[in-house]
């Protein structure tokens, strides 16, 4: 199948459709020892709410999700 159009990462950035999202995930090395580490994820989505939903779906065992207030305009 031949596609009619390609939307590049740069175009998504220019249009304000890339959101930075920090995800706190728990890690357990031994019983009773809990650690949290943070992962920064960049998501293509038209809204902040959809970006949060996508990340919550990708990381269902998250401890916390923090979406940037504004879309990312430059490449990470």
What kind of region is each of these model predictions?
Residues 1-26:
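Short N-terminal "domain-start" leader segments
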Residues 2, 6, 58-76:
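Short, mixed-charge low-complexity intrinsically disordered segments
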Residues 34-47:
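A short, exposed loop/beta-hairpin motif centered on an aromatic-Gly-Thr core
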Residues 13-15, 45-49:
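A short, structured loop/turn motif at beta-sheet edges
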Residues 8, 40, 49, 74-76:
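Serine/threonine-rich, low-complexity intrinsically disordered segments
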Residues 26-35:
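Short, cysteine-centered beta-strand-loop-beta hairpins and adjacent loop/turn segments enriched
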């Amino acid at each position: 199948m031949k596609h009619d159009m390609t939307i590049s990462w740069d175009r998504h950035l220019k249009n304000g459709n890339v959101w930075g999202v920090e995800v706190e995930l728990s890690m357990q090395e031994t019983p009773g020892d809990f650690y949290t580490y943070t992962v920064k994820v960049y998501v293509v989505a038209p809204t902040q709410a959809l970006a949060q939903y996508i990340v919550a779906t990708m990381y269902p065992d998250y401890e916390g999700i923090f979406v940037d207030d504004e879309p990312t305009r430059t490449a990470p």
